[in-house]
Amino acid sequence: MRMNSMCAIMSLTDSSSKDLYPLTRLRPVAALPVAGRYRAIDFQLSSISHAGIDSVGIFIGGSGRSIYDHIRSGSAWGLESKLRGGIFTFSQTYLKQVMGDESFDENNFYVNHKEFLKKSLAKYVVVSGGKIVAKVDLQDVLDFHLANDGDVTLIYKNVPVEKVRNHPYEKVAVLEQDNKLQRLISSLDWNYPDEMVAHSLNMYLLPVKTLLDIIERADKEGIR
C-alpha cells in the first residue's frame, strides 16, 4: 500500500434529480451536459485524476447507461483498468433499497461499498456526489486533513447567500470559530446572518477505516 494513498466513491443518487424531469428521468444529474461538450461528472473525475487517484467506485441510483456510455473505460482521465484500480460502477441502488437485503448476503445494500473499499487498498477515501461543478485539488485537501488530524474533512466554499438561499437541496456548513464543523443543515433552515455562507460541496475526505465503521453502524441501524 502506498503511504497516504486515496480512492474515491461517487454517489449519484441525488434527490434533486426529480426536479429536473424529464432530463433526469433516465439519467443522473451527473450525466447532464455542461457547456456543450462536457458532463457534470467530468469535473469530479478530473479532480480525482489530478490527485493521482486510480480507483473510483461510482454508485448509481437508477440506470447507469448514460454514465457507462460517457466514461467508457475512463481513459480520458487516465483511469482505465490497470493491474489494480480503474472505474467500477454499481447501478440500481434504488432497487436494493426497495427490495431489502434480508434474504441473501449478496443483496446487502452495502456489500459493494465494503468490497470496493477493501479491494482498493487505499488508506483514505474521497466521497462525493455528482452534481457540483467545481475544480478541487484533492491532494491539498489530504494535506489539510493530515495537518489538522480530524476524523472527516468537509469540502465547502464560501459563496454569497443568493447562491443557496431558497434551494432546498443545498446544505450549509455551520462552523465553529476554529472552522470545525458543528453541523450541516438545509439551506432553508439557515437564517443567513452574513452576506457569505459556507456552501457544502458534498465532498468529504476520511480514512477508509472510518468509512467502513460508519457503514457498519448504518447497516446495523437499517440506514440506507
Residue ranges and their predicted role:
Residues 52-54, 121, 149, 180:
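Short loop/turn motifs at secondary-structure junctions
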Residues 175-224:
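Catalytic-core segments of class I nucleotidyltransferases/pyrophosphorylases
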Residues 74-76, 170-177:
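Short, hinge-like loop/turn segments at secondary-structure boundaries
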Residues 2-85:
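N-terminal glycine-rich phosphate-binding loop and ensuing alpha1 helix
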Residues 62, 128, 206-207:
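A conserved hydrophobic position in a structured secondary element of the catalytic/binding core
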Residues 84-171, 218:
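Conserved beta-loop-beta/alpha segment of the NTase-like Rossmann-fold superfamily
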Residues 41, 145, 207:
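Residue-level signal for inorganic ion chemistry
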